């Protein structure tokens, strides 16, 4: 193993000089003894003259020039397989849950090639989430990629926790959760939520949270993905949850600036599209097994045209857009049914009835949107009888798209509901056909199936 010495430290960036004939390769891991602890560095650039520029996978406090650095001769490797289930790990795959060592069956490098073209498989099977608005408007494909887009505080993490709870319990497969640059409190909540739902033994948790250096936040998504790839290559259907993919981009921006690259649009790294592509192309399903991924995407200043969310859009099969306007009406989940899309919403995949009901719901909501201006200026009385009916049904649909969540029982005080796709389609079809025109709109708010709305109406 070659050894070199530190010649410069600038924040998270460390330059190391090696003898000319033993310069480490890009992405190789180096190790330096920093006081009591060992610090891992990852090579990012070869500067010439035997000098490599590295990013620290931990705090660089206490490093000094002249310290000896060892080249490990391979990229960062993390434990994979069943030993990781029920454990919380950091970017290097080290346990941070105080439960002792992870019995390692095997270690894989976090930098791996994406599956080749002939290995890929395309599935048309639907994944039922039990959340009405998602199952109806933007159905998820098994082995597909879903993005949850939303600004600050509209419910991305709560939606994701509900999805994990519903899918992990109903789907009974393995899941991997990568917390990328999110709040440590959310990671803690998530751990306890999984413990309470008795699904912790089926989930691997990998955290690189907000307080960690950019190197950790940039690579932790790859650590989680590597663990998911191992389960997939064993022939399983695995779920990969990433919260939040925007922080992955942001960590890349920080690293890029520290490495001295010229920024591109809005200050993002010039390699934004390539970095996103390298990650997203590995999240895919092969003929052996599948990875279904759900990714939360923070939208800066609620602007979907920002380069980071815009780059993410291109890789997804379904997009769930959370809207501040809908959240302000008190309708949760605050999914915008007119802005959310799915490649699966096709009569050949979901069937003619589902397709017709979903499009019917969207067209009524769209018409209501157009009539809002007239109502604001002239009032409801100026509308034709047909339009009044459209408005009444649209408001019922809007309320029926809300649903009490299991993970939000503490906030709502009402028990969570899992609604099957069959019940969802039946309920919305009934509203569109006018079967429930006699019920008050309040009866449709925060209920599961249509029968519950009918029951609630009797009490109002």
Swiss-Prot record:
Pfam families, sorted: ATP-synt_ab, ATP-synt_ab_N, ATP-synt_VA_C
Domain of life from the UniProt record:
Bacteria
Q: Does the keyword Cell membrane apply?
A: yes
Keyword annotations for this protein, in alphabetical order, are:
ATP synthesis, ATP-binding, Cell inner membrane, Cell membrane, CF(1), Hydrogen ion transport, Ion transport, Membrane, Nucleotide-binding, Translocase, Transport
Q: What Gene3D superfamilies does this protein map onto?
A: 2.40.10.170, Bovine Mitochondrial F1-atpase, Atp Synthase Beta Chain, Chain D, domain 3, P-loop containing nucleotide triphosphate hydrolases
Give the UniProt subcellular location, in the record's own words.
Answer: Cell inner membrane
Q: What InterPro entries does the record tag this protein with?
A: AAA+_ATPase, ATP-synt_VA_C, ATP_synth_F1_bsu, ATPase_a/bsu_AS, ATPase_alpha/beta_chains, ATPase_F1/V1/A1_a/bsu_N, ATPase_F1/V1/A1_a/bsu_N_sf, ATPase_F1/V1/A1_a/bsu_nucl-bd
Q: What's the protein here called?
A: ATP synthase subunit beta
List, alphabetically, the GO terms of the cellular component aspect.
plasma membrane; proton-transporting ATP synthase complex
In terms of one coarse class, where is the protein primarily found? membrane
So what family is this one in?
A: Belongs to the ATPase alpha/beta chains family.
Protein task = Produces ATP from ADP in the presence of a proton gradient across the membrane. The catalytic sites are hosted primarily by the beta subunits.
Q: Which sites bind ATP?
A: 150-157
Gene Ontology molecular-function annotations: ATP binding; ATP hydrolysis activity; proton-transporting ATP synthase activity, rotational mechanism
Q: Which organism is it from?
A: Photorhabdus laumondii subsp. laumondii (strain DSM 15139 / CIP 105565 / TT01) (Photorhabdus luminescens subsp. laumondii)
